[in-house]
Amino acid sequence: MATQETDDSLISTDVQTDATERGDQPDETVVETKHLDVHYGDEQALDDVSIDIPENKVTALIGPSGCGKSTFLRCINRMNDQIDACRVDGKVVFKGKNVYDDDVDPVALRRKIGQVFQTPNPFPKSIRENVVYGLEVQGEPASDEDVERALRGAALWDEVNNQLDSSGLDLSGGQQQRLCIARAIAPDPEVILMDEPTSALDPVAASKIEDLIDELVEDYTVIIVTHNMQQAARISDKTAVFLTGGNLVEFDDTTNIFENPEDDRVEDYITGKFG
């Protein structure tokens, strides 16, 4: 289990985490949002979202298109900084530190909170260079052991270990997405954000990613946006339901969300009455 760090941990200090068995220990919060509002110009994308994300669990974010799921995800590692006219109010607290404080380095933050996107986006570089990018951007040397560790962690090593100098673009779509996961875990983050990571993949490749997520959560916290409610029910421990207007309407154990939701709107969404 990760130990508590001082407030300057997001600026320069590396953090080690120990794998924990899912469900064996009480939930520890790794990311907390407090009254989080997001606007794109005059349009509000998130409205007063407060939530505690548990460590070493899979948390799924579900809801209809345009409800703020991806916006919420991008707030956690400040990817919204790259969007013009985006204004973030409230707090996103990671290990006791508001990530929007002026002294937080977004690049250092993204080393600790990695991200995998909807469409596989390997760089037009070799498999090896894709993996080590996350380390080299921090000015750190990358060893062959680092490459192997990340590729094994992404369940890709056995498929590519004889072609590390080949282009990552030559891989299949599912392999490219696992390469992107390897790139995300190479810097040894604590949290991995996934924005619909299987939506562009065929069912077989998507199933491999789901199996991989189940393995990753032994060492990392995973927060995943998905439109596939069956996927959310299969792979997640917690589920947050967002609805139109950027409102978080319910957050609970996934079993409770899908079998006994408290909010009628959540039941209507899950049963397909709207969405």
Curated annotation (Swiss-Prot):
Compartments, record wording: Cell membrane
Record bears the keyword Phosphoprotein: no
Gene3D superfamilies with a match to the protein in the record: P-loop containing nucleotide triphosphate hydrolases (3.40.50.300)
GO cellular component, one term: plasma membrane
E.C. numbers: 7.3.2.1
Annotated ranges, domain ABC transporter: 31-270
Keywords: ATP-binding, Cell membrane, Membrane, Nucleotide-binding, Phosphate transport, Plasmid, Translocase, Transport
InterPro entries attached to this UniProt entry: AAA+_ATPase (IPR003593), ABC_transporter-like_ATP-bd (IPR003439), ABC_transporter-like_CS (IPR017871), P-loop_NTPase (IPR027417), PstB-like (IPR005670)
A Pfam family the protein falls into: ABC_tran
Positions contributing to ATP binding: 63-70
Compositionally biased spans, kind Polar residues: 9-18
GO molecular function, one term: ATP binding
GO BP terms, alphabetized: phosphate ion transmembrane transport
Renumbered residue ranges of the record's region Disordered: 1-26
Entry similarity comment: Belongs to the ABC transporter superfamily. Phosphate importer (TC 3.A.1.7) family.
Assembly mode: The complex is composed of two ATP-binding proteins (PstB), two transmembrane proteins (PstC and PstA) and a solute-binding protein (PstS).
Summary of the function given for this chain in its UniProt record: Part of the ABC transporter complex PstSACB involved in phosphate import. Responsible for energy coupling to the transport system.
The protein's name in its UniProt record: Phosphate import ATP-binding protein PstB 3
Organism: Natronomonas pharaonis (strain ATCC 35678 / DSM 2160 / CIP 103997 / JCM 8858 / NBRC 14720 / NCIMB 2260 / Gabara) (Halobacterium pharaonis)
Annotated gene: pstB3
